[in-house]
């Protein structure tokens, strides 16, 4: 049943307007990051690493939470129309399978987004910043860490989009979560807030490794928040029928 749900969710992406956002926002982020790097060459002297900090700063803080929030809101949009929610609750599909299917599809979109962001990073580094060689192998590692941290953001936004009928409100809350994550990370408590995990994983706006000596805690926090949001989704779907 889960496989069928995933196939059904994937069909929603065919000719979807979210693909325009998929391309536009990473390009905007890369443009801003490259411009900021080129304007501060006297300060940003660490080559590929310095360019990475500029590319990932606003991507991890604003653009990615907004994109994930939009993905999640779009996938729940059909269920919130008319009486579709009642039909879903009366169907033989386990409600948590529906949530898990949307989670899998947003992960796929996040993976594609991360890949596109990294391709833009390499392109801008070679073409505009004239970087020598290829990016250090640690930068793709940061990208993978960011994807692990993004799982909590994805689950959080799916829960918000599930319980809030408005399309715009979950997106605003995603942006707010990302901005809040910056301040919480600055205070040294980033592992305690789900929206900080992706920023820490990406090592955004930092020259030193933000997770040095904390990989275990980072993985535990990512898993813990993921479990929390899945349990919350299960309880809401089971007890409240999430009336929108």
What are these regions (language model features)?
Residues 75-107:
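Helix-loop-helix units of permease transmembrane domains in multi-pass membrane transporters
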Residues 26-68, 100-164, 205, 213-219:
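Secretory targeting signals
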Residues 21-26, 164-182:
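Pore- or pathway-lining transmembrane helices of multi-pass membrane proteins that form conduits
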Residues 1-26:
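Aromatic- and glycine-rich beta-strand/loop motifs that create alpha-glucan
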Residues 1-7, 76-89, 147-170:
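Cytoplasmic juxtamembrane interface segments
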Residues 17-18, 82, 94-96, 100, ...:
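Membrane-helix interface segments
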Residues 35-52, 171-244:
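Terminal transmembrane helical anchor/hairpin motif
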């Amino acid at each position: 049943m889960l496989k069928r749900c995933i196939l059904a969710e994937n069909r929603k992406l065919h000719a979807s307007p979210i693909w325009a956002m998929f391309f536009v926002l990473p390009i905007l982020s890369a443009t801003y990051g490259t411009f900021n790097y080129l304007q501060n060459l006297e300060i940003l002297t660490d080559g590929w690493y310095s360019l990475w900090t500029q590319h990932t700063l606003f991507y991890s803080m604003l653009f990615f939470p907004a994109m994930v929030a939009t993905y999640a809101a779009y996938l729940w949009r059909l269920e919130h129309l008319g009486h579709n929610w009642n039909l879903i609750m009366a169907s033989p599909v386990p409600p948590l399978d529906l949530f898990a299917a949307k989670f899998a599809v947003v992960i796929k979109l996040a993976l594609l987004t991360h890949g596109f962001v990294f391709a833009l990073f390499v392109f801008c580094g070679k073409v505009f910043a004239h970087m020598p060689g290829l990016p250090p192998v640690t930068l793709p590692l940061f990208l993978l860490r960011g994807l692990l941290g993004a799982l909590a953001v994805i689950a959080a936004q799916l829960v918000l989009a599930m319980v809030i009928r408005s399309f715009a409100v979950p997106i605003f809350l995603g942006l707010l979560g990302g901005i809040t994550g910056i301040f919480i990370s600055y205070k040294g408590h980033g592992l305690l807030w789900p929206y900080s995990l992706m920023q820490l994983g990406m090592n955004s706006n930092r020259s030193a490794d933000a997770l040095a000596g904390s990989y275990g805690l980072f993985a535990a926090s990512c898993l813990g928040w993921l479990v929390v949001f899945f349990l919350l989704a299960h309880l809401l779907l089971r007890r409240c029928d999430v009336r929108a």
